[in-house]
């Protein structure tokens, strides 16, 4: 139960020391040093000796292997070592020393979603992209479950010749042509890369699981489970346990993945916002894009509050979470005849249809309101339906366990106001339904209106076709971007609510079956959807850069739900740019976007100079000596979106697009009206006569009249006979 609640929705970044570290006084530091000469850099043994030379004189030669836990080659010039504070001070005096930072511990942040995203077998984009055949997706996670049917290598090609990875399973577990690499990077653990938590198995199968018939949870959501890129290869790098994910281990895994030859990196984990030179995911991701490796990462699960994002660097695709159109419906039926639809994956056929006494202990006890462990013991809930509030730092499944332990017959889980109307189909331990905020308030009002409230739960099973999808989940972290306000984040949203995918064990306590699946939610689930889609795009367009692929995903994103109305948030209000980014991913459109915005490595360096970072700190990120002789502001980066702070003076920004659509084509600009801002684009028409031809345009922003909102949003779109290329705009008015 604990594993499910930890990984279904990740919580805040945590910092802690292990027991061993406390007892020895040593802590893990990530040490950055100057680059040695090329000869030393090219020889692994010489590089190790160079790193060892930075250790304090008090560290004897025999201690070195136990002190240095990771040596970095691609993502950083430096190493991770166990050191005391005094030893770090001694190292700071050495020539070539740059910095030493304490490791941070980060948190982990489909039978139907391929079809929901327009992917169908033997036709369309899936067929055109060859299902991602030959692309290698590297995932940094809790490990993987070899032998699960989702990781069968039926119809899989052999790994590409470039692959240099390792398989470190023990016993009878092995790699195959689907799982082509699996390694453990949790320092000091000595465990194989098998998955004890479930999170890594779930994300890996979401990204690239093979076709598995009759996948379901408790008989619900039944269908063929398959990942986004079913013919892509998987490489798992185990960096997380139930204690979290050390960024020193993450950096080591990124280092290895780059050397192994992955094509896509998928990171369903993150922490707080930091300057990029303190953010080891940003540092490792930059090393990856230097090699043409795409990096996709989850936005975080701290929504709907603003500025709660993780993974904000512009060279990372930052992914928020959306709903899809399938629900596993469980309806709360009240004694007054009112009914309120909710969700639950556990739907027992033998639950009686009779109404039972209904109670809400939270009226008099806050702990009991959240149904924390033991909080119901002083209440008479035996044989009753118990209302529990969502939140209170108590996992949803823990709440149902509390009700069961106290003798309750069923649970109605009610959202708080901040949660809005989004619900989850969890595998509860007793009959239950999860209802939205409005329904929860009506149910509590009914309880207060009568001395004998009663309720039951009517289980309706799996229903597909909810037209209000996609919508933004309440937990999905929101912008604005704190680390770089001039870059819109998240970049994109994708399915992350009630995602069915592979699981190491049966959640139904069944034995003798390997068809083990679970339904969980989080931006951790959205990220591998996008990682798999990126694998499809890499297969279809092997010459596209990471920035070009990101541009294609963003500029082709959907703005509407299945009803043709604007995408909504958890309050059923139109979602803003800080919730959706560019919009909801549309894989088929992304494969043929018409125009792309590309970015070169030098552009990123000028952008980092424009952030005002010290040259030494930029060098840590980009792994080369930097002289900031020229710089650009954030809004001048050739990004597929705009985020500006606009005062009284007009601001002008240029963008350059590359034609990847019809060779001969003409695009005309359309400007969505933005309150308080006049937007002018010149030229208003772009004409192309050949493929890969480039064109540059300028956008002018000017305040116009009074404004009531500090943040306003809009968009510019370039339209031809075949394409619409859209860039969202955020303006902060001052």
From Swiss-Prot:
Question: What Gene3D superfamilies does the record point to?
Answer: 2.60.40.2310, 3.50.30.30, Peptidase S8 propeptide/proteinase inhibitor I9 (3.30.70.80), Peptidase S8/S53 domain (3.40.50.200)
Write out the catalytic residues in the record. 141, 199, 524
Start and end of every PA domain? Answer: 357-442
Query: Which Enzyme Commission number(s) are on file for it?
Result: 3.4.21.-
Main location group? secreted
Q: What's a GO cellular component annotated to this UniProt protein?
A: extracellular space
Q: Which UniProt keywords apply?
A: Apoplast, Glycoprotein, Hydrolase, Protease, Secreted, Serine protease, Signal
- Glycosylated residues: list them: 172, 222, 306, 448, 509, 652
Q: Which residues form the Inhibitor I9 domain?
A: 28-109
GO molecular function (one): serine-type endopeptidase activity
Signal peptide boundaries: 1-20
This protein's record includes keyword Nuclease: no
List the subcellular locations.
Answer: Secreted, Extracellular space, Apoplast
Q: What induces it?
A: Regulated by RAM1 during arbuscular mycorrhiza (AM) formation after inoculation with Rhizophagus irregularis.
Q: Where is the Peptidase S8 domain?
A: 114-591
Q: Which InterPro entries match?
A: PA_dom_sf (IPR046450), PA_domain (IPR003137), Peptidase_S8/S53_dom (IPR000209), Peptidase_S8/S53_dom_sf (IPR036852), Peptidase_S8_Asp-AS (IPR023827), Peptidase_S8_subtilisin-rel (IPR015500), Peptidases_S8_3 (IPR034197), S8pro/Inhibitor_I9 (IPR010259)
The GO biological-process annotations, alphabetized, read as: arbuscular mycorrhizal association; proteolysis; response to symbiotic fungus
Top EC group: hydrolase
State the function annotated in the UniProt record: Required for arbuscular mycorrhiza (AM) development during AM symbiosis with AM fungi (e.g. Glomeromycota intraradices).
User: Into which family does the record put it?
Assistant: Belongs to the peptidase S8 family.
- The entry's protein name is Subtilisin-like protease
Naturally occurring in which organism (per UniProt): Petunia hybrida (Petunia)
